[in-house]
Design a protein with these regions (language model features):
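Extended acidic/polar, glycine-enriched regions
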Residues: 1-49, 510-512, 516-519
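Secondary-structure capping and boundary motifs in well-ordered enzyme cores
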Residues: 5, 51, 79-83, 135-145, ...
Length: 519
């Protein structure tokens, strides 16, 4: 079976007429052929946990089913649009799993067209091509696909054409963000009330003021829109300054380096405390929050009320993930921030609360500050909300919501918007490659790269590969009798820097290698 003229996602099919008068043929079996614009597998991953293996399968299967003409959010309902937020969080995972270079190159043309056609000020609509319920004025974390996706593609494939083609779009988006910050809008009101003076948000320049989708479908709704939008504005400015350097645009590099530092400074003035913790105040968002307890470094516990006026909230997993992964925390505060970040996970019993904007940054941020053990606990969590909860309950692709289906009560999430094939939360897949296998580019396109495998949780082995533009990179490790054995393959004409778990560092050229260390 193969669809003609239209494609619809489905899981089950009913065949009627078999054995009746209308059919003289006996149907023995039916093969359904998936329609997709991507068919070259570039990433393989396997480990000792069968549920994680199924999760990896579901991530890839959802990618294949949604990458048709445009990266749709879901293939089975009346939406099926190229949501920018979905694509930017999944871009790196998608590029590890499959060769998406040509597919995304075409979609970036759609994104450029959408920006050019619908907003002359540089805003990026929420979908490309434009359609349905979205904002042509763009919003933080979604319009940032204009910078993030080209950058991720350049990192993976090393094709400078991508940056050259997209540079004007990237620059227009960052300039648009700059035009919508506090310097140009003055005091912000939410639901008719001014942002509280205690937070200093009413006067700090470079803070984003746009109201937008924020950390979409988060479980605790406690990350203010302007927090995530400002964090992403800093990240886009950072990407643009690096892009300007690569393209030899010296004046732009200087300008956007300064802009990044200014936004970072404003972010810290608004939300980062002297002790490295993050806090924000109730009236910065109209969302309803649930945040529980905050545990300070000295072990003292504070329970915050729920969006009471001028009351600081215990920050979300997303709040810390964005601040850490975007390098917004000053170095002298990072050690303390690490502990608060860890607590944001542990106080929720190692269950997820992140939404769309936090999902791709949570595990990488934890690893960045040496909290690999916490990242493994999150990955191996089987209770809701978690990545493996859907797997345990029969999912074959990634759910749109953490609570798309609750087995314990037999209930479904909001049926008006509840997709069972929605790739965004599959963004954890990048961490399988970058951290468990340890395959990361150093030189764009993997001319040189890192191999820094990590073990943790209950895993006893992991193995996999990534086919880079220079050839297949393989990485495999195993734990046995107190020893860590590691095998890898480095493509010809490339160089790898291997960092083993005990800290040993080796420089490798093309060939296959075997290592064994005590752990």
């Amino acid at each position: 079976f193969i669809p003609t003229f239209a494609s619809h996602g489905f899981r089950y099919v009913e065949i009627s007429g078999n054995g009746c008068d209308i059919s003289k043929d006996m149907i023995i079996s039916v093969d359904g052929l998936a329609i997709s614009n991507i068919d070259i597998v570039t990433g393989e991953f396997e480990c000792s946990n069968s549920l994680i293996n199924r999760l990896q399968h579901n991530i890839r299967w959802g990618e294949i089913g949604n990458f048709l003409l445009i990266p749709t959010d879901c293939p089975q309902r009346n939406e099926r649009m190229g949501w920018t937020g979905d694509m930017q969080v999944f871009a790196k995972t998608g590029a590890y799993n499959m060769n998406i270079k040509s597919f995304i190159d075409k979609w970036l043309d759609d994104l450029i067209d959408a920006q050019t056609m619908y907003n002359k000020n540089g805003a990026v609509p929420d979908t490309a091509p434009l359609g349905g319920d979205n904002r042509i004025d763009g919003c933080g974390g979604w319009g940032d696909a204009a910078t993030i996706v080209p950058w991720e593609m350049y990192e993976t494939y090393g094709d400078i054409h991508i940056l050259k083609k997209c540079y004007d779009m990237m620059k227009k988006w960052v300039e648009y963000q700059s035009s919508t910050d506090r310097r140009n809008y003055g005091v912000r009101t939410v639901d008719g009330k001014e942002v509280p003076e205690q937070s200093d948000l009413a006067t700090i320049p470079y803070i984003q003021v746009q109201q937008c989708r924020g950390d979409h479908l988060t479980y605790d709704n406690s990350t203010p829109y302007i927090y995530s939008a400002t964090a992403y504005a800093a990240h886009s400015a950072d990407i643009l300054r690096r892009t300007a350097y690569i393209l030899g645009k010296t004046d732009d590099e200087k300008r956007y380096t300064e802009l990044f530092e200014n936004i970072k400074r404003a972010f810290n003035d608004a939300w980062v405390n002297d002790d490295g913790s993050v806090s924000y105040y109730g009236e910065v968002s109209s969302q309803t929050a649930h945040c529980g307890e905050s545990v300070a470094l000295d072990g003292s516990v504070t329970r915050y009320t729920y969006y009471a006026e001028n009351t600081p909230h215990c920050p979300s997993q997303t709040a810390y993930a964005l601040a850490v992964d975007f390098d917004l925390i000053p170095t002298d505060k990072l050690k303390n921030t690490r502990e608060y970040f860890k607590n944001s996970i542990l106080r929720n019993n190692c269950k997820l609360t992140v939404g769309f904007l936090g999902i791709s940054h949570l595990a990488p941020a934890l690893s960045k500050v040496g909290l690999d053990d916490v990242a493994f606990k999150l990955l191996e969590q089987e209770d809701n909300p978690s990545w493996l909860y859907s797997v345990k309950n029969g999912a074959t692709t990634i759910w749109e919501r953490w609570n798309s289906y609750i087995a314990e009560t037999g209930t479904f999430g909001d049926v008006s918007m509840n997709s069972f094939n929605h790739y965004s939360y599959g963004a954890i897949g990048q961490w399988f490659f970058t951290d468990i296998l340890g395959i990361c580019p150093v030189e764009f396109g993997y001319k040189s790269f890192m191999l820094s495998p990590k073990f943790g949780g209950g895993l006893t082995y992991a193995k996999g590969s990534f086919t880079s533009p220079y050839g297949k990179i393989s990485s495999a490790w195993k734990l046995h009798d107190g020893k860590f054995t590691y095998d890898c393959t480095v493509p010809t004409n490339t160089t790898a820097t291997l960092k083993l778990p005990n800290g040993d560092i080796h420089t490798l050229v093309g060939g296959s290698y075997h290592f064994e260390i005590n752990v």
